[in-house]
Amino acid sequence: MKRTGLVCRWKPVHLGHEALLVTLCERSSHVLIGLGSANRRNARNPFSAAESARMIELVLAPRFRNFELVLVPDLDDGPRWSALVHGLLGELDLFVTENAWVRELMTPLYTVRHPGTIVPPERHVPIDGTLVRRRMARGEDWRSLVPRAVAAYLEDAGLVERFQKEFGLETLARELVP
């Protein structure tokens, strides 16, 4: 693969993200990493785009230089959003997404693959950001779900405490709503 792109929220970067990002950087000459929901900060997006960018850099920068971070705002308009992403990322050999809606939007523009078809089985980690945020909100172990450097950053920067104060109760309440 030459140019690969993806857009995720990275809230926070977890071990599943790390496995995907490392695999893409190993297999691609250039990886364009979209920081989705860059214009949102709420219970589903509790970390700023700059904070998410720092998490990705902590994971990738010690080993790779073939990646670029791109801010991708939400537009609340799928067709406009896909056109924006295409404009920001340009031509790609591959676009990667786990999100069915994003897959539908991007398939007319790119060859699209699910991360599960790219990450080798021995690296696959079944974690999502919702699980990490729920554990943070409950005060349970979340550190084992994220790369060590990310855990240290989240704690040292006071981001876990801030998340718990600002969005902890809302995160827990979301579990109760079907």
Predicted features along the sequence, with ranges:
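Nucleotidyltransferase catalytic core that binds NTPs
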Residues: M1-P178
